[in-house]
Amino acid sequence: MASVARLVDSRVLIPLRLLGLTALAFVAVGAFLLLFGRNPIEAYGAIFKGAFGSGYGLSEVVVRAIPLMLCAAATAIPARMGLLNVGGEGQLHAGAMAATWGALTLGALPRGALLPGLVILGLLGGAAAAFVPAFLRWAAGVNETISTLLLNYVIVLLVEYMVRGPWKDPMSYNWPFTPEFPESARLSFYWGTRIHAGLWFALVAITLFYLALRRTRWGYEIRVIGDNPDAAARAGIPLGRYVLLTMCIGGALAGLAGMAEVCAIQSRLRPGISTGFGYTGFLVSWLALHHPLGIVVMALLLGVLSVGGDMVQISLGLPYATVNIIMALIFFVVLGGRFRKSRSA
């Protein structure tokens, strides 16, 4: 009976609790808007209209959710065994940089050979960026939260150096970006929109994450480590190996998001290829309680808020910061609910 109760709690009550906490966050934002003389119904209506009022808005929700799903998975996979990977932003830039090297160096290859190569380079770039803090955690006990966060700045600044120096387009009139990628290095777009092949990367990654977590020994051992690392060590589960494995897989997915951004949306590497996707993906993962299916839902929700924020600015004259406040309140309310539950347990 106890196991049945836990199953009901995990499959029914936890999603309902998450929805309730999210709704509470929207109520809190409404109260905040009322304090400043704004109608929250109008604000939410503008967000809804911006995201769903046209085919373009709906497609942009998906476009903005793609890197969020991949970066959220980069956080969630290590988090299931108790690791905090805050390095999604740097790992995304590392994957973008590796894919850029491939596009600029191997651009003469046919599309059928070049694109798979760029995908592999993006994965390897992100994995390499995650390997450094993972190795430090395994070999020296260095806190991965600090090391991944600090490494973000190193990698982002390295991208700045490359696009202002060795990779700078000589025809850019002194703008800091690389030459445009050849057509063979660009991902496909669909349905006359900016939705690109990165969507399939994200959905496949989320599906494999879900199946591996639920139906493989690898997923079972990760969950055991996350629940009780001491018991896992006594049972002979190799903790160090899983630290390296989960961090590198997570980094690879963030790197894949970077590859998709430069090979689809930007068609070149430039500063600011990410508008904080790595950090927002971290937020998405925590909002989703590190659950693969929850990641898809929350990434789409934040995509709606991001696209709808443009309409809030136009129709109500509210600053775009209003949307950031909504996201922040959702984050704090959901995390606050989890903390309260853990304290009372």
Language-model segments: which ranges?
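Cytosolic-side transmembrane-helix boundaries in multi-pass membrane proteins
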Residues: 1-24, 30-34, 227, 234-241, ...
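Single transmembrane alpha-helix segments in multi-pass membrane proteins
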Residues: 31-36, 46-106, 119, 123-145, ...
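Transmembrane alpha-helical segments in multi-pass inner-membrane proteins
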Residues: 248, 254-328
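Helix-loop-helix "hairpin" substructures at the membrane interface of multi-pass membrane proteins
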Residues: 192-268, 292-293, 297
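Short, non-helical or kinked segments that cap or interrupt transmembrane helices
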Residues: 37-42, 79-96, 138-147, 221, ...
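Hydrophobic core segments of alpha-helical transmembrane domains in multi-pass membrane transport
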Residues: 18-34, 71-76, 96-102, 123-128, ...
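N-terminal, non-cleaved signal-anchor transmembrane helix
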Residues: 1-65, 80-81, 167-190, 339-345
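Transmembrane helix-bundle core of multi-pass membrane transporters
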Residues: 144-215
